[in-house]
Amino acid sequence: MDVMKENKMKNIDEYLYKYGLHDCVVERIYVQNNSLVFCFGKGVYNLNENGTETTKTTACLMYLEIENLNKEQMWEHIEISKINKNKINEIDYEKFIEEVNKYKFDILENYLSYFGNSVLLEGYTSKNRYQIKISEISKIEFNFK
């Protein structure tokens, strides 16, 4: 295994065993440089060595760094599915961001995959249920306030 891929996996492992996003609220999502940034105004959960949620952190930003992220071609790395009465439709990144920034995004589940270095977040706004898959993540970083 090459060193770069090993470092990416180590970074994802660090995140996976350190923080939980279940029942956390994303208040805003935006792009900064090569990162997709999620704003958690009420923090995320610290996980103990068994993966159990313990305490909540302070407000934080989660940076999902994606090499060569192009704001005009977000579909290359981000797939968003809107689930409504058992119908699944793919929607634009811009429409999803607009809804999140207006209503917030409550995360029910978060999944990680080494294949494609992906994160899948499942949750809802006050209007709809969504799944958002972000792939080719080179680094995950949390910045606490």
Q: Where are each of the predicted segments found?
A:
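Surface-exposed, interaction-prone regions used to assemble/regulate multi-protein complexes
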Residues: 2-145
